[in-house]
Every structure is written in structure tokens, then in C-alpha cells.
Amino acid sequence: MSVSPVAIVSTPVAAPESSAAVAVPPVVVRWRGVEPYETSFDAMRAFTDARTADTVDEIWIVEHPPVYTLGQAGDPAHLLVGDSGIPLVKVDRGGQITYHGPGQIVAYLLLDLRRRKLTVRTLVTKIEEAVIETLAAYNLASVRKAGAPGIYVASGVHEGAKIAALGLKIRNGCSYHGLSLNVKMDLRPFLAINPCGYAGLETVDMASLEVAADWNDVARTLVRRLIANLDGESAAADTPHALEHSND
């Protein structure tokens, strides 16, 4: 799920009127378990369409069965095989093609950017920082890369390999879609695509980097870092993180 100035699909919204500062309700975290991609996609759009000015922002933590997703302006030619046996879903986020599957954390960010007084670029930066901080907690150094959206390995044998991807849709000033972080996956499906439109781009997971991380622990760390960057460290400390990972 790549994100860049051209990988963020948005609908125009009027600038908010200036007003006194209003407290922003803390983000609600929901663990949706192992869920078909189409179910999450439909639920995100329904949630966003039904939002009011009082709707509390949410982060959804999900794990998907194998699926390729192609962004709104994506080129199907980036799927390199005719019949991979893995479904392809065309979606309304920005970016090109990516893969989701077991062992990957997917976080969907359903946020009111106007209420939070966030630009899209600032939101992207906060998401990227949360991923970088999460990986740092496991002694993995990672970086952004100019012109190639996502989070990449900073050094070593796999320097430059992609470990996390981002993609957003902004509708009426509210975001959906989000990020994916590879923990311990079967990486072979990435070989059948040009990940996020980049031919030959290596994709890795934390296990490839010799980090035996528990999916639940990484998910909790990621949630804490996302909330800390959005709502502050104190909010992150007070947020329940009772996430349970299942392979069912």
C-alpha cells in the first residue's frame, strides 16, 4: 500500500473555519482478527460514509488471507503472472499493487484530519515515524526513501528492501486505508508483482532480518507508537492493547 503525493487519493474539501481549540477524543483501537480483505474494505467505506462531526476516530488491526490489491490508478501489468491463485481486488486508495497475507500486520486509520488539524503529509509522516519507531524497538534500523514510498531496511545485506507499505484515501477530510508491516510471512507472493510499482524491489519481513518477533507484541508496539504520534505519549500509555493473534 504505497503512499506519496501522487499515491494519496482525495476528494476536495473546504478549509475548516477557524474556531477555538476543541479537545479531540482519543483513538479507539479495534482488533478485527483474520478477515477477508473485501470485508475490511467495505467496512472502512461504510464507516467513513456514516461519519458525523462527533464520530470517534478508530484504528483497526487486521490480518488478511492472501490477496493482491491494486490502487485506483494502478497498472494491472504490475501483476507479473496470469494466474497466481491469489485474488486481485481493485481499491480506491492511491498507489499501485501490493500483497497482504498471513503474518503481516495491517493497520487501518479512520481519522478526521480536519478535527485533528492534520495535513495529509503530516499524517503520512506520523504513520512513517510510528513504523520506524516500532522497528527500532526490535533493534531494526529503517528509513524512508525519496521517490519510493514506504519504509525500507537501513543497512546490512537487505539494505533498501521494503518492509512496510502505506496507502491512504481521503474523503470529506477523513482518512481510511493505512499501512502494512511484514512480521513473519511467506514472501513468495511478492515475487509475482512489482511491489508498489517498482520492478525488482526486494520485500522482506522481520523474520528475514533475523528478528524472531511475536506478531501480537509487534502489533501492540505499533498501536502504541501510532497513538503516541496521534494523541501523545500519555494517551498511548493508557490505551488497552488486548490484541490476540490467531491463525484460524
From Swiss-Prot:
The keyword Translocase does not apply. GO terms for biological process: protein modification process. The lineage of its organism: Bacteria, Pseudomonadati, Pseudomonadota, Betaproteobacteria, Burkholderiales. This is Octanoyltransferase. In the reaction, the free carboxyl group of octanoic acid is attached via an amide linkage to the epsilon-amino group of a specific lysine residue of lipoyl domains of lipoate-dependent enzymes. The active site is at C196. Catalyzes the transfer of endogenously produced octanoic acid from octanoyl-acyl-carrier-protein onto the lipoyl domains of lipoate-dependent enzymes. Lipoyl-ACP can also act as a substrate although octanoyl-ACP is likely to be the physiological substrate. One of its GO terms (cellular component) is cytoplasm. Its EC number is 2.3.1.181. The record marks K162 as: Lowers pKa of active site Cys. One of its GO terms (molecular function) is lipoyl(octanoyl) transferase activity. It is an enzyme of class 2 (transferase). Signal peptide: none annotated. The gene is lipB. It catalyses: octanoyl-[ACP] + L-lysyl-[protein] = N(6)-octanoyl-L-lysyl-[protein] + holo-[ACP] + H(+). Substrate binds at R93, G94, G95, Q96, I97, T98, Y99, H100, A165, L166, G167, G178, L179, S180. Belongs to the LipB family. It is found in: Cytoplasm. Pathway: Protein modification; protein lipoylation via endogenous pathway; protein N(6)-(lipoyl)lysine from octanoyl-[acyl-carrier-protein]: step 1/2.
